[in-house]
Amino acid sequence: MARRSRHRLLLLLLRYLVVALGYHKAYGFSAPKDQQVVTAVEYQEAILACKTPKKTVSSRLEWKKLGRSVSFVYYQQTLQGDFKNRAEMIDFNIRIKNVTRSDAGKYRCEVSAPSEQGQNLEEDTVTLEVLVAPAVPSCEVPSSALSGTVVELRCQDKEGNPAPEYTWFKDGIRLLENPRLGSQSTNSSYTMNTKTGTLQFNTVSKLDTGEYSCEARNSVGYRRCPGKRMQVDDLNISGIIAAVVVVALVISVCGLGVCYAQRKGYFSKETSFQKSNSSSKATTMSENDFKHTKSFII
C-alpha cells in the first residue's frame, strides 16, 4: 500500500510539472541573451534584424523604439512616423535607407503567434549606434599677444560621434603634439591637448606669429576651421619709460607754476579784492536799512 501511494504521488507531481511548463510556454515570453549592436554611418543605410522563429501567416509583428517614452516604429503591418518614407520591411527586419543621428537608440521587436497552448510572445532587442562626422569646429585665436605671456587657443566640435581628436596648424603646417621633435625655428614651449582641442603657449614669442587653424577628425571624417592670424609683439619698455617721464615733467611744470604764482602774490591780490567788494556791499546794505527804518517812523 505504501509503495502504491508513493507511485501515485510521483505521478501527480509529474502531471503538475507538465501543466506548469505548458502554461509557461503558452503565456510566457523568451528573449535572446546576446543583444545586437548595429553600427551605421549617418546618411547611409542600416538593417535592424529581429532574431525570432520563422514568420507564419498568423504571426503578429511589432517594432518599438525604447526611451523615456516608447514609440511605435512598425505597428499593424505599417511603418510609422518618418520611417514610412525612408525605411522598408524585409521579412521581420527593418531596412533604414537614410540613417540620421536621431535614430540612435534601442529598438525592440515583438512577435506573437498562436500555439496549441495559447498565445506565444517572443522579443529581441537591437541597439543602433550612429557614427557622425565632425562639423566645422569653432576656433578661438587671439588677434594679438605680448611676448612672454601665456596664450591659449581653443578648438571644439559638438557634433562628431565618436568624439573627434584635434590637430593645430600654423601657416598650413601641422604642429606636432610633442614640440621638442619639431624644428628649431618654432617655439617649443607650447602644449597641445588632442582630446580637448587646446593649444597653450607657456611663454609666447615673436616666432609664434602666424595664421592658426584647427582640424577635428574621427573615424567618419574630418573638418577644419578657417585660419586666423595671431600677431605677437615685444613689450615696448622704452615707450613706457618715455611716457612716464613726460607725465612727470608735466606734473613738475604745473607745480612750479603754482609756486611762482604764490610768490608773485596773484592769489593774495585776488583775496584782498574779494574782501573790499564784500565790505562795500555791507556798507550799502546798512545805509538802505537805516533809510527804511526812518521812513517807517515818520
UniProtKB/Swiss-Prot annotation:
<dbReference type="InterPro" id="IPR007110">
    <property type="entry name" value="Ig-like_dom"/>
</dbReference>
<keyword id="KW-1003">Cell membrane</keyword>
<dbReference type="GO" id="GO:0007159">
    <property type="term" value="P:leukocyte cell-cell adhesion"/>
</dbReference>
<dbReference type="InterPro" id="IPR013106">
    <property type="entry name" value="Ig_V-set"/>
</dbReference>
<dbReference type="InterPro" id="IPR003598">
    <property type="entry name" value="Ig_sub2"/>
</dbReference>
<dbReference type="GO" id="GO:0036477">
    <property type="term" value="C:somatodendritic compartment"/>
</dbReference>
<dbReference type="GO" id="GO:0005886">
    <property type="term" value="C:plasma membrane"/>
</dbReference>
<dbReference type="GO" id="GO:0070160">
    <property type="term" value="C:tight junction"/>
</dbReference>
<dbReference type="GO" id="GO:0035633">
    <property type="term" value="P:maintenance of blood-brain barrier"/>
</dbReference>
<keyword id="KW-1015">Disulfide bond</keyword>
<dbReference type="Pfam" id="PF07686">
    <property type="entry name" value="V-set"/>
</dbReference>
<dbReference type="InterPro" id="IPR036179">
    <property type="entry name" value="Ig-like_dom_sf"/>
</dbReference>
<protein>
    <recommendedName>
        <fullName>Junctional adhesion molecule B</fullName>
    </recommendedName>
</protein>
<feature type="topological domain" description="Extracellular">
    <location>
        <begin position="29"/>
        <end position="238"/>
    </location>
</feature>
<keyword id="KW-1133">Transmembrane helix</keyword>
<feature type="topological domain" description="Cytoplasmic">
    <location>
        <begin position="260"/>
        <end position="298"/>
    </location>
</feature>
<feature type="signal peptide">
    <location>
        <begin position="1"/>
        <end position="28"/>
    </location>
</feature>
<comment type="similarity">
    <text>Belongs to the immunoglobulin superfamily.</text>
</comment>
<feature type="disulfide bond">
    <location>
        <begin position="155"/>
        <end position="214"/>
    </location>
</feature>
<dbReference type="GO" id="GO:0007286">
    <property type="term" value="P:spermatid development"/>
</dbReference>
<dbReference type="InterPro" id="IPR013783">
    <property type="entry name" value="Ig-like_fold"/>
</dbReference>
<dbReference type="GO" id="GO:0097241">
    <property type="term" value="P:hematopoietic stem cell migration to bone marrow"/>
</dbReference>
<dbReference type="GO" id="GO:0045123">
    <property type="term" value="P:cellular extravasation"/>
</dbReference>
<feature type="glycosylation site" description="N-linked (GlcNAc...) asparagine">
    <location>
        <position position="98"/>
    </location>
</feature>
<feature type="domain" description="Ig-like C2-type">
    <location>
        <begin position="134"/>
        <end position="238"/>
    </location>
</feature>
<keyword id="KW-0472">Membrane</keyword>
<dbReference type="GO" id="GO:0031642">
    <property type="term" value="P:negative regulation of myelination"/>
</dbReference>
<keyword id="KW-0225">Disease variant</keyword>
<keyword id="KW-0393">Immunoglobulin domain</keyword>
<feature type="glycosylation site" description="N-linked (GlcNAc...) asparagine">
    <location>
        <position position="187"/>
    </location>
</feature>
<dbReference type="Pfam" id="PF13927">
    <property type="entry name" value="Ig_3"/>
</dbReference>
<feature type="disulfide bond">
    <location>
        <begin position="50"/>
        <end position="109"/>
    </location>
</feature>
<keyword id="KW-0965">Cell junction</keyword>
<dbReference type="InterPro" id="IPR042625">
    <property type="entry name" value="JAM2"/>
</dbReference>
<comment type="function">
    <text>Junctional adhesion protein that mediates heterotypic cell-cell interactions with its cognate receptor JAM3 to regulate different cellular processes. Plays a role in homing and mobilization of hematopoietic stem and progenitor cells within the bone marrow. At the surface of bone marrow stromal cells, it contributes to the retention of the hematopoietic stem and progenitor cells expressing JAM3. Plays a central role in leukocytes extravasation by facilitating not only transmigration but also tethering and rolling of leukocytes along the endothelium.</text>
</comment>
<dbReference type="GO" id="GO:0005178">
    <property type="term" value="F:integrin binding"/>
</dbReference>
<keyword id="KW-0796">Tight junction</keyword>
<dbReference type="GO" id="GO:0050901">
    <property type="term" value="P:leukocyte tethering or rolling"/>
</dbReference>
<feature type="glycosylation site" description="N-linked (GlcNAc...) asparagine">
    <location>
        <position position="236"/>
    </location>
</feature>
<dbReference type="GO" id="GO:0071593">
    <property type="term" value="P:lymphocyte aggregation"/>
</dbReference>
<feature type="transmembrane region" description="Helical">
    <location>
        <begin position="239"/>
        <end position="259"/>
    </location>
</feature>
<feature type="domain" description="Ig-like V-type">
    <location>
        <begin position="32"/>
        <end position="127"/>
    </location>
</feature>
